[in-house]
Amino acid sequence: MPVKGRIIRVAGPLVVAEGMEGIQMYEMVEVGEERLIGEVNRVVGDKAYIQVYESTTGLKPGEPVYGTGSPLSVELGPGLIGRIYDGIQRPLDVIREVTKSIFVRRGVKVDALDRSRKWHFKPNTTLKPGDKVSGGDVLGEVQETSLITHKVLVPPDVHGRLKWLASEGDYTVEDVIAVVEADGKEIELKMYHRWPVRRARPIIEKLEPVEPLITGMRVIDTMFPMAKGGTGAIPGPFGSGKTVTLQSLAKWSAAKVVIYIGCGERGNEMTEVLETFPKLTDPWTGKPMMERTILIANTSNMPVAAREASIYTGITLAEYYRDMGYDVLLVADSTSRWAEALREIAGRLEEMPAEEGYPSYLASRLAEFYARAGRVKVPGRPERLGSVTIVGAVSPPGGDFTEPVTANTKRFIRVFWALDARLAYSRHYPAINWLVSYSAYVETVAKWWHENISPKWLEYRNEAYEILLREDELREIVRLVGTEGLSEKDKLILEIANIIKTGFLQQNAFDPVDAFATPQKQWKQLETIIDFYHAALEAIKRGVTVKEIREKLAPKIRELILARYNVPNDQLEKLDKLKQELLQALQELIEAKAGRASAAT
């Protein structure tokens, strides 16, 4: 029987209730006369400490608290794609219809999935009554959108013999589509099931991420690649372009499903996402972007405690689509706001603060979250591989990467895209600092690049990276003595580094051609730059100066830098032609130099 207690104290998002004998940790409760949704996060005797996911204004001691007997859970079934939810999986469009208001009122109860919509269910023809079924087995399919075929799965905790499976037809998510017999009991399975958000869905084994998650952003794909099933973070101070970079990731990534969590960020940023995503076209399929996207809007003016729920809601939805065998990208903007919510709740609970006031369990919570990423073999028949890639924004105050959230996040991620305010202020976007950023997936994804694009990819990528590092060392010398004190080879390094920075690393997220670069275009650009560098080195050995190269080839070098705008993804022969023209011009310089030298002798 569900527990019923009463409120004795209200402190911001924290409510203390007594008479709660039998309540469990992380049980979902309904607080007050309006039955606000909350979650138990501490139990002392008959007292329960509850974090409430809605505004507690007006709650008073004496009001009832009702236990539900189950943990905070989400509904998993067809109808999730294309929806916009709040942090506790309430669809915002349905709330507006129910309340006839543009504001999210307290205590609103709406279903996460549309109970009236009918879906065309196609049963799995390999399953017959009497067959053994277990968690993860595919019962049938539903065409959720033109991009996503939704596999209806046996819930992870159900095992038994299939007694009955529905025939092909139109059903709502509430209709029973299968009956499983287990331990003498009949379990009715519907098209949806519920799953606790704090509990990771089971897997068979984790696999090494080996395939790159192509994002269309050159600085990421070529310099600091992300793998499908990987973990990454984008830390950066205010105004450095975190949100635009994350939105570009969500727009152009080669993931089958994208889940975008706006966690505690400004409302106008979430509004921008809500306005732009429905109008965008997926570059991989040509279909509307919303046909593969789920948005979770939990802005800074919504209750603080719901930030934590939104992160867990998002990762649970991601795991569900991973279990179908899809590659899922989860983008969280920003994990710092979630950490601040943890800090506030910990303060209300009067826990001993650790560094900068954050709770001592900050690291373990971050670890739990990032550990749910991965490329995995999922349970059930037929055998499937799926992946969840997590990219979290971090907003360190003043851009200080030593603060606790950034420092702890770095322990659990393998890709670190550090945004630099100086680059952003000089209009270099994405403002990813190549001296501070790193990726542990460069070697593992190199095999894919070698097999699909070019066997020289890793060699050329490393050479470009070394040029950038060498340029940073030379910049200090140039500040002291100017460029005249450098050798011709070092002067060439500065010239090529400038081409790499402005013609390759920079990218305009709002330009129709430059916003997304295919792996083939990225390789052609990189190959042209590095081959030009090799030819220029040879020219310098033959006595040609960098000044002569700059003067003779200025128009062609400018053309190379602007190729990111002027060469569409389907016209890469233009880059081949440009490379030949550059190499030919260098050869002419060498011949002219040799001719002058022989004339002088």
Curated annotation (Swiss-Prot):
Its EC number is 7.1.2.2. It is a peripheral membrane protein. One of its GO terms (biological process) is proton motive force-driven plasma membrane ATP synthesis. ATP binds at G236, P237, F238, G239, S240, G241, K242, T243. The keyword Membrane applies. One of its GO terms (cellular component) is proton-transporting two-sector ATPase complex, catalytic domain. Keywords: ATP synthesis, ATP-binding, Cell membrane, Hydrogen ion transport, Ion transport, Membrane, Nucleotide-binding, Translocase, Transport. It catalyses: ATP + H2O + 4 H(+)(in) = ADP + phosphate + 5 H(+)(out). One of its GO terms (molecular function) is proton-transporting ATPase activity, rotational mechanism. Signal peptide: none annotated. It is found in: Cell membrane. Disulfide bonds: none annotated. Has multiple subunits with at least A(3), B(3), C, D, E, F, H, I and proteolipid K(x). Component of the A-type ATP synthase that produces ATP from ADP in the presence of a proton gradient across the membrane. The A chain is the catalytic subunit. Belongs to the ATPase alpha/beta chains family. This is A-type ATP synthase subunit A. It comes from Hyperthermus butylicus (strain DSM 5456 / JCM 9403 / PLM1-5). The gene is atpA.
